[in-house]
């Protein structure tokens, strides 16, 4: 039985078009208040993005649900997340698949996320301190790649690390950003534009 605040959010997400019950169940199962600073705990189940420090944010629940739904996951999906951040999106993915790989360029955020995931007994996640633009070649190929910050263009490395039939979901752009879904079909990449979005930029190269 979920709390009224959680149920209200789930109802709102359904109204906004989220249909995958597995995704909604994962959102209900992950305590979002554990991934935000104490000052924002009262807003944890509001359908808004919140700051997590280091110039980064925890995404709006609608956007987490939308991007996760677009990945078309199965329990066997090999998943790469670019931008571990607070670890919230990571936790949602960990409830849906057998194993998640996640890359974060800010060491402090990576450590905090690992601690949160461990405290929630989510041990099916591998995290790495690295440049998200480069993906995680040693663990490739992936059935699904999700990027939680916006590059100005789609990183080539991420496209090449998609397996046949794999899906990449990411925001793209600088001043004007759009959520894109890229599907690999043989040697081709089919790119669909989903909706206008606003994310922090995906910083290239420099680790922190």
UniProtKB/Swiss-Prot annotation:
Keywords, alphabetical: Cytoplasm, Methyltransferase, S-adenosyl-L-methionine, Transferase
Enzyme class: transferase
Record's GO cellular component terms: cytoplasm
GO molecular function: protein-L-isoaspartate (D-aspartate) O-methyltransferase activity
Disulfide-linked positions: none
Reaction(s) catalysed (UniProt annotation): [protein]-L-isoaspartate + S-adenosyl-L-methionine = [protein]-L-isoaspartate alpha-methyl ester + S-adenosyl-L-homocysteine
Gene3D superfamilies named among the record's database cross-references: Vaccinia Virus protein VP39
Intracellular or extracellular location(s): Cytoplasm
InterPro entries tied to this protein: PCMT (IPR000682), SAM-dependent_MTases_sf (IPR029063)
Pfam family, one: PCMT
GO biological process, one term: protein modification process
EC number(s) recorded for this UniProt protein: 2.1.1.77
Keyword set includes Transferase: yes
Active site: 59
Function, as annotated: Catalyzes the methyl esterification of L-isoaspartyl residues in peptides and proteins that result from spontaneous decomposition of normal L-aspartyl and L-asparaginyl residues. It plays a role in the repair and/or degradation of damaged proteins.
Similarity annotation: Belongs to the methyltransferase superfamily. L-isoaspartyl/D-aspartyl protein methyltransferase family.
Annotated protein name in UniProt: Protein-L-isoaspartate O-methyltransferase
């Amino acid at each position: 039985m979920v709390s009224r605040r959680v149920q209200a959010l789930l109802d709102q997400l359904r109204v906004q078009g989220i249909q995958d019950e597995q995704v909604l169940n994962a959102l209900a199962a992950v305590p979002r208040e554990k991934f935000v600073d104490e000052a924002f705990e009262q807003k944890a189940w509001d359908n808004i993005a919140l700051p997590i420090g280091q110039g980064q944010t925890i995404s709006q629940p609608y956007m987490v649900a939308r991007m996760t739904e677009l990945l078309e996951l199965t329990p066997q999906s090999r998943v790469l997340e670019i931008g571990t951040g607070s670890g919230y999106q990571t936790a949602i993915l960990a409830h849906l698949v057998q194993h998640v790989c996640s890359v974060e360029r800010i060491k402090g955020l990576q450590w905090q996320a690992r601690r949160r995931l461990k405290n929630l007994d989510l041990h099916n996640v591998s995290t790495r301190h690295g440049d998200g633009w480069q993906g995680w070649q040693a663990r490739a190929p992936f059935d699904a790649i999700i990027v939680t910050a916006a590059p100005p263009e789609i990183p080539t490395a991420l496209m090449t690390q998609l397996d046949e039939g794999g899906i990449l979901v990411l925001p793209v752009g600088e001043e004007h950003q759009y959520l894109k879904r890229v599907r690999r079909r043989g040697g081709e990449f089919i790119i669909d534009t989903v909706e206008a979005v606003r994310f922090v930029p995906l910083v290239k190269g420099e680790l922190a």
